Swiss-Prot record, chains A, B:
Molecular function terms from GO: ATP binding; ligase activity, forming carbon-nitrogen bonds; tRNA binding
Organism: Staphylococcus epidermidis (strain ATCC 35984 / DSM 28319 / BCRC 17069 / CCUG 31568 / BM 3577 / RP62A)
Pfam family, one: HIGH_NTase1
Reactions catalysed: cytidine(34) in elongator tRNA(Met) + acetate + ATP = N(4)-acetylcytidine(34) in elongator tRNA(Met) + AMP + diphosphate
Function: Catalyzes the formation of N(4)-acetylcytidine (ac(4)C) at the wobble position of elongator tRNA(Met), using acetate and ATP as substrates. First activates an acetate ion to form acetyladenylate (Ac-AMP) and then transfers the acetyl group to tRNA to form ac(4)C34.
Protein name: tRNA(Met) cytidine acetate ligase
Record carries keyword Protein biosynthesis: no
EC numbers: 6.3.4.-
Location within or outside the cell: Cytoplasm
GO cellular component entries: cytoplasm
């Protein structure tokens, strides 16, 4: 069975995702479509607007199998996000990764990926890192401001391609053009497509524009967001007040004394938004800061980080997904494809289970990894 | 200057406290009255209904000097509470401790205190502790159910007397009769006196009964409680979900694997009240459990515990209190009587400062140890 993998967040699922999934199937000429989806927290450094179980249901309108991207992936910068996603794809024996990019030229992106693997070995690169420059800035300096590197989906695509070269050399890639300008748009101004940001805003504000830009047959799944990032603030404040510096220092992604800045700024902040603006410096991107705060919220320490895949959490599947899972289990009897979490399998997913408990605390939801059955359609 | 010390919580201050302070002054024939008062968290294992600054203002209607009982004292069982309170009194050169008791016979209580110091050295005592019996139960067995030990203020008084024998042999004691039956009454049914419980309830429910039982001249200080113990629940739940077992194990007062019970029961609980009832066993008293939960909330670890007094935090004073402080500073130039907390003195009060920050998070108050001047009348 030939399979195509999509690395996704579906926060929430919309027509752009449907379009990408449909084209990916056609162009890859594969039988099975697999989404590797972020769980309850997303790469922007926020809780997802709906929990992963609902987002799985949405996803199954377009794909055959939904597995959870390990939490560490979702709360890392693009290279680690890509590494963990590609290793997950490898574990699932995926043949082709299909990703959206502004460029849509696989050749150009491949060329940059190869170049960047070289750049990163260069002494200049390490020197600039030491000087406190951000990773995207260094790359754009080293590549003489290559315009390809000014588009977020190109950057992520290049990270996938780098990870594939390093960790999954037999996997192939496919890229589908997406409109960069859409990505950060604040309001819905297109008849069929809109950015995640504008859709989340529409759902939050109870305005019905979102109805035009999500697939008809799953509209009943959409409701007011389960939670927003502001709900995290009291808990983050509590952590920053009560944890000693050494504990904060051990939190994943905190480095260079950022814990000091956190403990100073928390006393001047009375909302997530004000904390972000107090923490803002040239040195760090907003998403870096948000991911740090989510790692604080979830108490993810450097010791909790494992970039290897020892098991994959299956969140949902269609009939075709079920056949594919059978095929995987037959071919890789020593791998762990887990469709239900229980006392025996929970140890593989400690971070994800914790994230679900915290998500429920934020959102007053009650579906846990233990009490929620595999989603099937 | 001869001084009398009152070990108090004033949660909130009421006529019973005024009565006790007045009689203490008369009977001790002293010039200065000093309250050693719990800060923002009280021995019942709860946040106080008003922050310590407001409670200091209330207290100064009856006493000359208000100092803060170190947080560790407030969140410990009666022996450690008493030890830290008596050591604080010693640091303040207090001559006489005056406490309320149901018995009112200093001789009887002294006799029991001496007996109990002996009992605690007895192998039987340690054996019973190992069997998992609670401290009050063992004592009542060893003293053949002495009726004196069935009244909470007698027990606390005996703890003071024991601590004085051990740590402040030159300090003397005075006890004033209080009506035991009042202590836990739920409603106000007396014209002038009522229990703290019934007064807190009246304030919470916006019923005006409390007005009859607090001193007239300070009634304007009373308002709806700043917070209740239920406000702590989301934060405690968050801690119990996100902290690994080893971290919980290091929390002060947690022992014998109580961390396991906490992590199991938190998932079955959706309020502080339900958590308490889920945690309830014969082995532990409710106040023990509540104090454990406050130590979790404040992240007070075993390493944060210091039973020695290296400085005393002065919260408020009258003119007479000011003279006494002058006298202390002249006589003990190496001791630290701190009237304002700043970067230089903050290290003495790490636990108390943290408790204030958490109290403010719970209650939406904004008076910190740094921005609140000494209360003076």
């Amino acid at each position: 069975m030939k399979s195509v993998g999509l690395i996704t967040e579906y926060n929430p699922f919309h027509n752009g995702h449907l379009f990408h999934a449909t084209l990916s199937k056609q162009r890859s000429e594969t039988n099975v479509t697999i989404a590797i989806m972020s769980g309850n927290f997303v790469m922007r450094g926020e809780p997802a607007i709906y929990h992963k179980f609902k987002r799985t249901e949405m996803a199954l309108s377009a794909v055959d199998l939904v597995v959870e991207l390990p939490l560490i992936g979702s709360l890392s910068s693009s290279d680690t996000f890509a590494e963990i996603a590609i290793k997950t794809a490898q574990y699932l024996d995926i043949d082709i990764i299909s990703f959206g990019s502004e460029s849509a030229s696989l050749k150009d992106l491949q060329y940059l990926a190869t170049q960047m693997i070289d750049y990163e070995k260069h002494p200049d690169f390490k020197e600039k890192l030491k000087q406190g420059k951000s990773y995207p800035r260094i790359l754009s300096e080293l590549t003489h401001n290559d315009t390809l590197l000014q588009s977020p989906n190109n950057i992520l695509g290049i990270s996938y391609l780098k990870a594939m070269q390093q960790f999954a050399p037999h996997m192939s890639a496919l890229t589908i053009k997406r409109e960069g300008s859409l990505h950060h748009q604040k309001v819905i101004d297109h008849h069929h497509f809109a950015s995640g940001t504008s859709i989340r805003r529409s759902l939050m504000n109870d305005n019905v524009d979102w109805k035009n830009v999500v697939p008809n047959q799953i509209q009943s799944l959409y409701c007011k967001p389960h939670t927003t990032v502001e709900d995290t603030f009291p808990f983050i404040k509590h952590q920053l007040i009560t944890q000693p510096k050494e504990s904060l220092h051990s939190i994943y992604t905190i480095n260079e004394g950022f814990e000091n800045r956190l403990q100073t700024m928390i006393h001047r902040s009375d909302s997530f938004e004000s904390l972000l603006s107090n923490l803002n410096t040239k040195r760090y991107t907003q998403t870096y800061i948000q991911r740090v705060l989510m790692n604080v919220l979830l108490n993810i320490t450097k010791d909790d980080v494992n970039k290897e895949i020892n098991a994959v959490r299956v969140l949902g599947m269609s009939e075709k997904g079920r056949s594919y899972l059978k095929y995987l289990k037959a071919n890789y009897p020593n791998r762990h494809y887990i469709t239900n979490v229980n006392q025996k399998t929970a140890h593989y997913f400690k971070n994800e289970i914790k994230a679900t408990h915290v998500y429920n605390l934020l959102s007053n939801q009650s579906q846990t990894d233990f009490n929620t059955p595999l989603v099937r359609i």
